[in-house]
Amino acid sequence: AIDFETANGKRTSVCSVGVVIVKDGKIVNKIYRLIRPAPNYYTQWTTAIHGLTYDDTMEAEDFPDVWAEIKPLIDGLPLVAHNSPFDEGCLRAVHELYDMTYPNYKFYCTCRTSRKVFGKDLPNHQLHTVAERCGYNLENHHHALADAEACAQIALLIIPDPPKPKKAKKADKDTHVGDLFASLIPQQVKKNK
């Protein structure tokens, strides 16, 4: 599971990353790194969300150096995020900013899957709400590692055996995460559509 926090409204402004590596249903590694954001400024509203400031990341490494450490640890693994379009968008944006080749990581979304699995049984599908529903106590919400760990715990419960990543065929480009896990959705939720 992966989670990014950003310094401002730009997707390239990743200022921290949390990665939780799961193999055979067990958490085997946790990584948390601060990143010098690009552009390197913080807004009041982002700092209010995650608590990070310019001083926290002033001496942090740039994204390429941080990613050089993380990339070999996740090669070949699917990535799971809560609201994956945001995290995947950040990852693509910083790869483009630094002229790095993007390896077309396969992303799965616990938020989208939660909507399929829990439907209207939850008041919303925010990370802390879904984590609580799955019996996980999310402390320190909006800390990248805490959020990645909550996402991993959710995925272990609602995506117990995600499909192995495969190269997308032309017909697969319109496949959505929810479609991949349709067999996991309880019948009563399917009927509510």
Describe the predicted segments one by one:
Residues A1-N104, K120-H142:
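Conserved non-catalytic scaffold segment of RNase H-like nuclease domains
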Residues L91, T113, C151-A155:
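Buried hydrophobic packing segments
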Residues P103-S114:
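Conserved beta-strand -> loop -> alpha-helix junction used to position metal-binding or nucleic-acid-contacting
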Residues R133, A152-K193:
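Acidic two-metal-ion nuclease catalytic site recognized across multiple nuclease folds
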